[in-house]
Amino acid sequence: METATLVAISISRLLVSFTGYALYTAFGQPSEQLRDPFEEHED
């Protein structure tokens, strides 16, 4: 394979894995530990 193809595949895999980790953090098990500032604020 050419170098440009390997670089493009590597960058794509990095972006996909980062997106997957962000979704897991937002909606997976760790999301229970996140605080919600809108629920904490009382009018």
UniProtKB/Swiss-Prot annotation:
Belongs to the PsbN family. Its main location: plastid. GO terms for cellular component: chloroplast thylakoid membrane. It comes from Cycas taitungensis (Prince sago). It holds the Pfam family PsbN. May play a role in photosystem I and II biogenesis. It is found in: Plastid, Chloroplast thylakoid membrane. This is Protein PsbN. InterPro entries: PSII_PsbN. Keywords: Chloroplast, Membrane, Plastid, Thylakoid, Transmembrane, Transmembrane helix. It is a single-pass membrane protein. GO terms for biological process: photosynthesis. The chain crosses the membrane at residues 5-27.
